[in-house]
Amino acid sequence: MAGNSQRRGAVRKPGTKKGPTVGSGGVRRRGLEGRGATPPAHMRPNHPAAKKARAAAKAQQQRAGRKADETELVLGRNPVLECLRAKVPATALYVALGTDADERVTESVQIAADRGISILEVPRTDLDRMSNHGLHQGLGLQVPPYAYAHPDDLLATARADAAPALLVALDNISDPRNLGAIVRSVAAFAGHGVVIPQRRSASVTAVAWRTSAGAAARVPVARATNLNRTLKSFADAGLQIVGLDAGGDTTLDELDATGPTVVVVGSEGKGLSRLVREHCDAIVSIPMAGPTESLNASVAAGVVLAEIARQRRS
């Protein structure tokens, strides 16, 4: 048989004799020790799934950036007039052709003209398209994106003032009306600014502007990438961090806020988050005579800011 070196008369070529099968001595096995399970596809840098995930994340970030830079269109006769009365920054007033000019339309056009805001008459179909067929009643006010400050800017502003620093931080407040009302209270009681998280928080929209009664033009609002780190930096700068909660172990009557202070207001539903609580020097509750369990976030902030202002006048 061909290739059978065991047959009689066969001659084996030198160096072709196979020896006994020998393993690696455990080298390959030891080389694999400690590596653990194979990571999922999206965690392997060169895997198509990982590349796809990175591309999706980048696209989402770009969309978020574009959204943050987009202008806002306030719709309806009452909302537009309220924004103009509150001196909300605006770049254009759109009036649909053929709109009945009642008192609200007339006053809106007059205020816009006095402030140098462009007044543009457009076909109603154009305003329908611009508003995604929202209820505009023939009026639309274009509002530019709000220019947010940096948290460090608030500290610099506070240090330039003779009075001790007074800042308000919002822990995931989602209602822009609460944000606007808090900004208004900060302005009324000599606060130096408001800090909001960059994500999962109300932003300074036209609704917030309107609720603030124009105070957003005087009180800087800063966005924090990480609210907990920002609170820690405030604490390192010597500010007292005071959280508000109905179940706080310190009452407002016991609080001493004559020194530099940050008041942290929790979200409307869940209150202060666990990590934010851990950064607070005190959790303060507001004494109430009636059976009401808690106050609205903006009302609670206003009560505390009024008390701090009283302490600092004494």
Swiss-Prot record:
UniProt keywords, alphabetically: Methyltransferase, S-adenosyl-L-methionine, Transferase
UniProt-listed GO biological process terms: methylation; RNA processing
GO MF: RNA binding; RNA methyltransferase activity
Region entry Disordered, spans: 1-71
SMART domains for the chain: SpoU_sub_bind
Pfam families membership: SpoU_methylase, SpoU_sub_bind
Cross-referenced InterPro entries: Alpha/beta_knot_MTases, Ribosomal_eL30-like_sf, rRNA_MeTrfase_TrmH, SpoU_MeTrfase, SpoU_subst-bd, tRNA_m1G_MTases_N
E.C. no: 2.1.1.-
Top EC category: transferase
Binding-site positions, S-adenosyl-L-methionine: G266, I286, L295
One Gene Ontology cellular component: cytosol
Record-stated family: Belongs to the class IV-like SAM-binding methyltransferase superfamily. RNA methyltransferase TrmH family.
Name of protein: Uncharacterized tRNA/rRNA methyltransferase MSMEG_6073/MSMEI_5913
Species of provenance: Mycolicibacterium smegmatis (strain ATCC 700084 / mc(2)155)
